[in-house]
A protein has these predicted regions:
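Exposed low-complexity, polar/acidic, P/S/T/G-rich flexible segments that act as propeptides
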Residues: 130-185
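Extracellular carbohydrate recognition and processing domains
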Residues: 75-113
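Aromatic sugar-binding surface patches on proteins
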Residues: 99-105, 251-271
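Short, solvent-exposed loop/turn segments at the edges of extracellular beta-sandwich modules
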Residues: 128-130, 290-296
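Residue-level recognition of secondary-structure-to-loop junctions
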Residues: 267, 271-279, 283
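Extracellular beta-strand-rich recognition modules
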Residues: 39-49, 57-59, 63, 116-126, ...
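Residue-level signature of extracellular beta-strand-rich folds
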Residues: 3-6, 14-15, 273-275, 287
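Long, low-complexity, polar/charged, intrinsically disordered or flexibly structured peripheral segments
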Residues: 205-262
Length: 301
């Protein structure tokens, strides 16, 4: 299509009317629910160690639009908030892996949560310790939104701002493996801590929120965003309860405004302009003409 012009404005921008280039959406920064074609969270789960008995019922993948987040400075209040929150199982127990070394991929739709603040939680709470308990890997976590204007948004794991809440753990069990205990000491910032010091009230509050750089029982490793890990521990270890919970995320379909194309500036002349539409259809083509200098700016659509 070729367009002809009269006059000589300083600047002209062109909105073709195609998806992503509609003048009516030039100021839009948030999609409406009806504009969202897909909203889903994707991740994989695989277990190391454990058996069918210790794996069963050990894991919960949860979502809530009622959780206000982890404070990080009041353990009892945070435990109460997590316990009393109305969580929904994002993945049913029947759909979780039943054995080790079996990777399962999940794509969970979240369209019903559009416009709400959601928190995602991963919880390891083994019910059976008659054998080695599972090590769980949460891999490739992403939140994906696709819009009807052809654009998309991806939120990666590191942008979820996860916090740990270690509700139940046993330092005596952890001390049976010196490497495991050392990893926790490193996470606490003091490799010279004694076991008794770690059991003190001072460190109990710190340990409740601690993540570690290693694969040890009772604590999450989140230093590798594409592979969150925690472990249940050896046979007869205390059955732990450890959570990894995201900050609330607003599912508002944020998007970039539709953009026009600058086809003329003050140093150019323009009498005709051609644009090729790749698909047949009805489009509203819009030209925005502006004159501007240091004392005045005006325009016409």
């Amino acid at each position: 299509v070729t367009f002809s012009f009269d006059g000589d404005p300083d600047f002209i921008s062109f909105f073709s009317g195609e998806i992503g280039h509609e003048y009516k959406h030039r100021n839009r920064i948030e999609m409406q629910p009806e504009d969202v074609e897909k909203c889903e969270i994707n991740f994989s789960i695989v277990y190391d160690y454990g058996n069918a008995k210790t794996i069963e019922g050990s894991t919960h993948i949860l979502i809530s639009d009622q959780f206000g987040g982890i404070s990080g400075n009041n353990v009892e209040k945070d435990k109460e908030a997590v316990t009393n929150c109305d969580w929904t199982e994002l993945v049913s127990q029947e759909d979780l892996p039943k054995a080790t070394k079996v990777t399962k991929d999940y794509s969970c739709p979240l369209t019903s949560y559009l416009g709400k603040e959601i928190s995602i939680a991963f919880r390891l709470n083994p019910l059976d310790n008659s054998a080695t308990m599972p090590v769980i890997h949460i891999k490739g976590l992403q939140l994906n939104l696709e819009f009807n204007n052809g654009k998309s948004t991806t939120i990666n794991a590191k942008n979820f701002e996860f916090s740990a809440l270690n509700v139940t753990y046993n330092l005596d069990d952890l001390s049976k493996n010196n490497t495991h205990l050392t990893k926790l000491k490193e996470a606490l910032g003091n490799k010279n801590l004694t076991l008794e010091e770690m059991k003190s009230a001072e460190y109990a509050d710190k340990i409740a929120y601690t993540t570690v750089d290693g694969n040890i029982p009772y604590f999450w490793r989140i230093s590798q965003p594409n592979d969150f890990v925690t472990s249940g521990g050896s046979k007869d270890y205390t059955k732990g309860d450890t959570w990894l919970i995201s900050n609330p995320i607003l599912l508002n379909g944020s998007c970039d405004p539709d953009a026009g194309v600058a086809i003329k500036n003050i140093s150019q002349t323009l009498e005709i302009y051609s644009h090729t539409y790749e698909e047949a259809g009805t489009y509203t083509a819009t030209f925005v003409a502006n004159n501007a200098n240091y004392v005045h700016q005006g325009g016409q659509v």
